[in-house]
Amino acid sequence: MPGGQTTPHTRLYVITQENCINCPAAKAVINEAIDDTDLSYEEIDLLNMDPDFEFQLLENQIFIASTPSIVLDKEGALQLLYSGKVPTVEEIQKVLRGN
């Protein structure tokens, strides 16, 4: 990633749902932000969420109220970065650099 490195075992989750008008833009931002890195992201449908992942969210006191929601997983510790908002590429890259 230009200008910094990411923490090992970092992953992003983009929580979406059908008819979400901002979800395609959020996925495009994430794709661009992690381009040229070893990071990946996983899209998760809010209404068909894996129960284990849902439990992880609850353990980390993360409640998804709107989509798109972007969750950072740093070695198992989940953090809600954005909910109902499409961040900029620069905002995502800054978070991933830890700034």
Each language-model region and where it sits:
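Non-catalytic, surface beta->alpha helical segment in thiol-disulfide oxidoreductase systems
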Residues: 71-99
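Chalcogenol-based redox active-site neighborhoods
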Residues: 2, 24, 47, 60, ...
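Short amphipathic alpha-helix with an adjacent loop that forms part of the alpha/beta core around
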Residues: 55-61, 93-96
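Thiol-based oxidoreductase modules, predominantly thioredoxin-like and allied folds used
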Residues: 39-54
